[in-house]
Amino acid sequence: MSAPKKTYSSTTSAKSKHSVRVAQTTADAALEAVYEMSGDSGDSFDYSKSVGQSAESVPAGAVTAYLQRMQRGGLIQTFGCMVAVEEPNFCVIAYSENASEFLDLMPQAVPSMGEMDVLGIGTDIRTLFTPSSGAALEKAAATQDISLLNPITVHCRRSGKPLYAIAHRIDIGIVIDFEAVKMNDVSVSAAGALQSHKLAAKAITRLQALPGGDIGLLCDTVVEEVRELTGYDRVMAYKFHEDEHGEVVAEIRRMDLEPYLGLHYPATDIPQASRFLFMKNRVRVIADCCASPVKLIQDPDIKQPVSLAGSTLRAPHGCHAQYMGNMGSIASLVMAVIINDNEEDSRGAIQRGRKLWGLVVCHHTSPRTVPFPLRSACEFLMQVFGMQLNMEVELAAQLREKHILRTQTLLCDMLLRDAPIGIVSQTPNIMDLVKCDGAALYYGKRFWLLGTTPTENQIKDIAEWLLEYHKDSTGLSTDSLADANYPGAHLLGDAVCGMAAAKITAKDFLFWFRSHTAKEVKWGGAKHDPAEKDDGRKMHPRSSFKAFLEVVKRRSLPWEDVEMDAIHSLQLILRGSFQDIDDSDTKTMIHARLNDLKLHGMDELSVVANEMVRLIETATAPILAVDSTGMINGWNAKIAHVTGLPVSEAMGRSLVKDLVLDESVVVVERLLYLASQGEEEQNVEIKLKTFGTQTEKEAVILIVNACSSRDVSDSVVGVCFVGQDVTGQKMFMDKFTRIQGDYKTIVKNPHPLIPPIFGGDEYGYCFEWNPAMEALTGWKHDEVVGKLLVGEIFGMEMMCCRLKSQDSMTKFMISLNNAMDGTNTDKFSFSFCNREGKFVEALLSTNKRTNADGVITGVFCFLQIASSELQQALTVQRATEKVAIAKLKELAYIRQEIKNPLCGITFTRQLLEDTDLSDDQKQFLDTSAVCEQQLQKVLNDMDLESIEDGYLELDTAEFEMGTVMDAVISQGMTTSREKGLQIIRETPREISTMRLFGDQIRLQQVLSDFLINAIRFTPSSEGWVKIKVVPTRKRLGGNVHVMHLEFRVSHPGGGLPDELVLEMYDRAKGMTQEGLGLNMCRKLVRLMNGDVQYVRENAQCYFVVYVELPMAQRDDAASQM
């Protein structure tokens, strides 16, 4: 046997991928050189043969020259003209030969010298257009990313001819491509991407409405939508595989055209240089491949040809134009599809980047162009497609890993009964672990073969070859045994090309085998008739397919990372477990150990299941579940509280027929159907009916996530809904909308009740940036207004507020477009970097902006965030998390035991309410009722982190301040009487009837806690504790008023211990129970836009609580915005 030269593994590490791309670039350069030589010599260019020979070495200089020609060819297409200018003076440094004619500078008759416009090196391009057009070019050049304003509509100075100016920056200035505006073009009234993106709104809506889990359907849909948008004869989705070759995975075409669906193409068909250009300029249009290109004239002082990498007019290479002509395609439009790419670097760390997944390719049998705004809309559609595709790719990977894990579990279970023979002799077996054509176990000099494999002697020979030439390795994976230099590869034929081998003992192996790639190819078009004599030497899709088959005839599909991980995991389980086939003691020990692990795992599963049930029952989020027939079989305490329907009455009722409002029936039925198919919807709004004490509310509004419930056989047996109660917020927003006054006065008000708000006009320019946004971002109103929301303010690079990822920007753009189309987006995750470089985590809601006639004129954006102080305190609070968890079980028991007698108290009170009572007795019962509600709310506070982090959803409802004061004082009466103290109540008369909007129960909770702490630390001899309320009415603007309330709880004596006060302010090292209560109350007050102070004076101490709440009554009728 000869020593191996090199092993080609199917690994997809970053280093390996880079090596493959470098090698492919060399092959591209070699193929191009052969093509150029054939043209010079007059010989014919044999494409199929040249592809096979392109792997030969090429000088580095030749590769560099090839890459330069691809980007700096000096030729453009005829459907426009190009001018390159210097910054900032706009002096011309290069232009196309057709520019003077295209810009209407060629005289129709002999003009006077004063009327002549001349285009030449050094000309100020602005002088060739109208003054407003020149100003538009200047404005675009002043932006950081000039391409965001494309297309810029300009008019020639002499003729008034309208043109699209499409600009981008290069190393020496600005390149401007000019295209004609045709009368039948879709109207775009202003510069900028947002206007163009509206053209793709319907297509984007359809893509987003597709069910998940079907990449084929997603690809089919996108080609249909692109064809409807552009009108090309053929539209294809073209996917790049791991080995860089391509495949048509979706196609829609004119019926008389030959189908290409299913065809595979060699990697050289789309050169690496072209792929690089697609990453930079994501839309490529060729109007007429038969047209003669136009040359560029440039300043002789420029050292190298002007870069056309980003130009929309860059002429096609002669090789590509010939390919198009041979296939009968005269015009094309190609769009890049880019997704996330997670690669491991040399240290094993994950590097998150972007990669070219493939292309969407449009062909037309006659010359054709689509206007730039429509091309821009298609580019945005590709961003959305890429984002959807990325989710599908990740989901498919997760499902594949899940399948592998399930198979591994079954194989491990087989080891308990018959190791290691069970993994090849039973079902499932090792062939089910990864995709393969055959597998084998070589163990103790015996063979177990499955599927298509080499013979026993050949497997023995492979094992000996591995032991001799790869003795230091635990295995080998390759897509070509021939390229891995296995001497007997030629004897295996096409049936066995690829192999993955795993060493399980010093001399024993597991093998997986794959046949050649051509076997896997699914030919979707008409199969080639051997009687038809195609000229394989011509460049054509069929000859490309022939070349592809030639390239891969000795190769299998590559082994994916996830497959190799699965093989390696099984190898680790087996290696060392069976050193000798007769070592029965070892086998017995392993069996016992695996059985113990299995039993231990079952115990842990039981514990986890019980804990999950407890968490669901006690969760502060409303949770309900139904069985496969739609009947309620889960109804936790929170949803029982918000709906007023007890658990006992909810169980067994129909969700759709009995509990859902009519307007939500269709939505819920769709959720149930999709979940029964395993498709889990998220963030869906549903409305439930109310019962009992909650009937005063029209409905309970929940934002729910649906989760499919499965049995041990993975069958869907029900659906669980985890919700967020947004009823109070919706009611408050509705009422606040009705009572809001002058818009400017409210939005511009620095009051803490006003959230961060920004807005964009119909062209995407920022017109609003309120004080709260200034404080949040660090960017002032005057610094951002007039800039583009996407690209200049929010973007990926040197923008005011840098976003986390490209997907984040795409989602932001989708939400803006949806709002402009009349569809609001509610609370999606939105993270950006502020001026100080700190990331802000927020929830973004977008709403349409309309004028008096109801016409949409822009978009309003609202952010919800936690306060900066709470964010800073987050780290400190999380340090106590472990201690809190330890106490959680104890608290859960106490909470549960309190609920039963509380239900008895509530029942007794309800009985008394039905009797004849005096006014005083009715007031006593009202006070008792709100105290019960406060106790119930405290019992449901299982997740203190939501309070600590500032994300707790406060209830918002109308309430009477007098009821709050009665409840607060009643809670302090027992303790005060025991200590012989008198509670003095000092409140203005209007407090008893004052009606406000807010969370009544939380307000009385914090006030009662401060009052009881004051009583607790007042000496009995002093004799009193006083609570005083000072209301101050404030006008926000227009007719909107808030009530500023100052509560002062004062008491004589030395006051609270210093340590307890420090705990309230998060400044203590530890936390007592009393301190935790005060700390939570202070955070609740801050959630109400207030604060708490504890003041010590000579004779007394006091809590001062400041709160501001909207008033529920106004002096006059509300005016509309």
From Swiss-Prot:
Q: Cite the Gene3D superfamilies for this sequence.
A: 1.10.287.130, 3.30.450.270, 3.30.450.40, Histidine kinase-like ATPase, C-terminal domain, PAS domain
GO process annotations (BP): detection of visible light; red, far-red light phototransduction; regulation of DNA-templated transcription
Domain PAS, residue spans: 608-679, 742-813
Q: Which PROSITE patterns match?
A: HIS_KIN, PAS, PHYTOCHROME_1, PHYTOCHROME_2
Q: Describe how it is modified after translation.
A: Contains one covalently linked phytochromobilin chromophore.
One Pfam match, by short name?
PHY
As one GO molecular function, the record gives: phosphorelay sensor kinase activity
Q: Where is the GAF domain?
A: 214-393
- Which keywords appear in this protein's UniProt record, sorted alphabetically? Chromophore, Photoreceptor protein, Receptor, Repeat, Sensory transduction, Transcription, Transcription regulation
Instruction: Return the InterPro entries for the record.
Output: GAF, GAF-like_dom_sf, HATPase_C_sf, His_kinase_dom, HisK_dim/P_dom, PAS, PAS-like_dom_sf, PAS_2
Q: Where is the Histidine kinase domain?
A: 893-1113
Q: Which domain of life is it from?
A: Eukaryota
Q: Could you say which residues form the signal peptide?
A: none
Q: Where does phytochromobilin bind?
A: 319
Give the record's subunit note. Answer: Homodimer.
**Membership in a protein family:** Belongs to the phytochrome family.
Q: Which PANTHER family match?
A: OS08G0260000 PROTEIN, PHYTOCHROME 1
Q: What does this protein do?
A: Regulatory photoreceptor which exists in two forms that are reversibly interconvertible by light: the Pr form that absorbs maximally in the red region of the spectrum and the Pfr form that absorbs maximally in the far-red region. Photoconversion of Pr to Pfr induces an array of morphogenic responses, whereas reconversion of Pfr to Pr cancels the induction of those responses. Pfr controls the expression of a number of nuclear genes including those encoding the small subunit of ribulose-bisphosphate carboxylase, chlorophyll A/B binding protein, protochlorophyllide reductase, rRNA, etc.
Q: What is this protein called?
A: Phytochrome 2
According to its UniProt entry, this protein's organism is Ceratodon purpureus (Fire moss)
What taxonomic lineage is listed for the species of origin? Eukaryota, Viridiplantae, Streptophyta, Embryophyta, Bryophyta
